[in-house]
Amino acid sequence: MSLKVNILGHEFSNPFMNAAGVLCTTEEDLRRMTESESGSLIGKSCTLAPRTGNPEPRYFGLPLGSINSMGLPNLGVDFYLSYAAQTHDYSRKPLFLSMSGLSVEESVEMVKKLAPITKEKGTILELNLSCPNVPGKPQVGYDFDTTRTYLQKVSEAYGLPFGVKMPPYFDIAHFDMAAAVLNDFPLVKFITCVNSIGNGLVIDPANETVVIKPKQGFGGLGGKYVLPTALANVNAFFRRCPDKLVFGCGGVYSGEEAFLHILAGASMVQVGTALHDEGPIIFARLNKELQEIMTNKGYKTLDEFRGRVKTMD
């Protein structure tokens, strides 16, 4: 039996990686991810200049997940480029970098810096079009004209295969519209579904107060709250974008949720809230649990069931 994934010119020992935003800000974070039993890792969504992010408290654990409004805290693109060029041990596992420019011009400037490193090292770009927690900055992925502009400019500036991280969609028409845009850009090779469900509100009934400070308490939901929405988005884009890969993200706490993401069409599976809660040791457990499910079902490889979810039509 094998959990290996061969995509994007790389071999991954298994489909698991962190979600951009969790255990990936500092060099120590990235080292811990590299030494874990994940198949890959991704850096923190970065901006041109370092950001401290939103005021604290900005993350709050919940019974079924989390709410956060981090505001893209990161060490700035040059730190992550330096890590990719000089520090990361590519013999251990491939590396993704996440970039989240605050404008299309900023995104273009960052990907131009990354391009020579990608050519030399094989670093993979995930372009974040879906951060819901920067005050005054709407999510690019909910404006299809702006999404098209970003993809056009980044494709021209970068000139290499890359992926996009998308917000969750909730309307069939929006699946169709987003897929139509993505399918126009052959350099977009993978679609990560989904970022957190934006602008939830959690209130503590004891003190009648919101639980995070930014944006009057509004923040992105993660964890088990997200799983059905994430699976729907993974499957919707898997069906609509047959020439692209889909990465699943949302609600993965065990091998079973990972199995469901792959069944819906995911090639890689990103872990966020559960990784935040459990630490990088989680990947050993996820691998073991996914293997047990495959053994019980008689599957030898991930390809045997990827995207094979049965419908009742």
Curated annotation (Swiss-Prot):
Pfam families assigned to the protein according to its UniProt record, in alphabetical order: DHO_dh (PF01180)
The entry's keywords: Cytoplasm, Flavoprotein, FMN, Oxidoreductase, Pyrimidine biosynthesis
Presence of the UniProt keyword Transferase in the record: no
Gene3D superfamilies linked: Aldolase class I
Catalysis: reaction(s): (S)-dihydroorotate + fumarate = orotate + succinate
Presence of keyword Cell wall biogenesis/degradation: no
Molecular function via GO: dihydroorotate dehydrogenase (fumarate) activity; dihydroorotate dehydrogenase activity
Cofactors: FMN
GO BP annotations listed: 'de novo' pyrimidine nucleobase biosynthetic process; 'de novo' UMP biosynthetic process; fumarate metabolic process
Role summary: Catalyzes the conversion of dihydroorotate to orotate with fumarate as the electron acceptor. Molecular oxygen can replace fumarate in vitro.
Family membership: Belongs to the dihydroorotate dehydrogenase family. Type 1 subfamily.
Subunit note: Homodimer.
Name of the protein described by the UniProt record: Dihydroorotate dehydrogenase (fumarate)
Naturally occurring in which organism (per UniProt): Trypanosoma brucei brucei (strain 927/4 GUTat10.1)
